[in-house]
Amino acid sequence: MRSFSFTKMHGLGNSYIYVDLFRETLPEEELPAIARSVADVHTGIGSDGLILICPSEKAPVKMRIFNSDGSEGKNCGNGLRCVAKYAYEHGIVSDRTFLIETLSGLVEARVAVADGEVTSVTVDMGEPRLERSAIPMLGPEAERVVAEPFAIAGGEYEITAVSMGNPHVIFYVDDIQKAPVTTLGPLVEKDPRFPEGVNVEFVEVVNERELHFRVWERGSGVTQACGTGACAAVVASVLNGKTARGEETVVHLAGGDLTIVWGHDGRVRMTGPAETVCTGVYYYRGGRNG
């Protein structure tokens, strides 16, 4: 049996198993299997996936994320806040503002600290990409997808698509409690019009400063929160005239609230909590199948 030390953390209920690769070593070829194993609620630890906290040549720390199905993701807003908290509290960084490398590029994080503990994290999520080719979604590459008709499973909808370094598609609903997250979500995620798959968000507009939000995440299914998805929802709401550019919007997720602003400088900034759940040692047999 092999083993490694882990920390379980969550951002608004979006939980991952975090492994510090400044101190641990995991075989690259086994990472998808390890992610599937630790995510299993019955035979593993139970989480939405695996996040590696890695050395970087471009920043003080690098984040790699593996979904619960073993696929590697490019970005995760809730994960970034947890990585920032871990890096500061474990001495990987000493400054309260620092860069984190992701597969989507470099991200700036700023931690708020009280009595040595990180209480909240603000992450500069960068500029959204809106052209169809950046999502990616089939169709005219340079066009934006804003309130575009979308037919699926016998229904007619309107969608807005946003890339926050990973793909998102937003559906507006009148009642978030009745949103077809588990029925429409998986169908849209794997729809061939999205060649790399897509995260599917359902949004109810409360007012121009508040949104209710539910998500079906690509590779993970229903989760309590999705930071990049909440950012995409705010961008989509500005594009559709439902919220205001440059103003803070509170997004109510199943796991709690995020405060997000799409600034006039083009950048999206997200503020929210990050929590440590537990630490431990995980035992596994090794091999590509776990």
UniProtKB/Swiss-Prot annotation:
Cited Pfam families: DAP_epimerase (PF01678)
Swiss-Prot/TrEMBL site (Could be important to modulate the pK values of the two catalytic cysteine residues) positions: H168, E217
Alphabetized InterPro entries for the sequence: DAP_epimerase_AS, DAP_epimerase_DapF
EC class name: isomerase
One BP annotation, GO: lysine biosynthetic process via diaminopimelate
Reactions catalysed: (2S,6S)-2,6-diaminopimelate = meso-2,6-diaminopimelate
Enzyme Commission designation: 5.1.1.7
GO cellular component: cytosol
Active site: C76, C226
Pathway connected to this protein: Amino-acid biosynthesis; L-lysine biosynthesis via DAP pathway; DL-2,6-diaminopimelate from LL-2,6-diaminopimelate: step 1/1
Coiled coil segments of this chain: none
Residues the entry annotates as binding substrate: N14, N67, G77, N78, N166, N199, E217, R218, G227, T228
Keywords: Amino-acid biosynthesis, Cytoplasm, Isomerase, Lysine biosynthesis
PROSITE patterns: DAP_EPIMERASE
One MF term in the entry's GO annotations: diaminopimelate epimerase activity
UniProt-annotated location(s): Cytoplasm
Top-level taxon: Bacteria
Oligomeric and partner information: Homodimer.
Family: Belongs to the diaminopimelate epimerase family.
Summary of the function given for this chain in its UniProt record: Catalyzes the stereoinversion of LL-2,6-diaminopimelate (L,L-DAP) to meso-diaminopimelate (meso-DAP), a precursor of L-lysine and an essential component of the bacterial peptidoglycan.
Official protein name in the record: Diaminopimelate epimerase
Species this chain originates from: Geobacillus kaustophilus (strain HTA426)
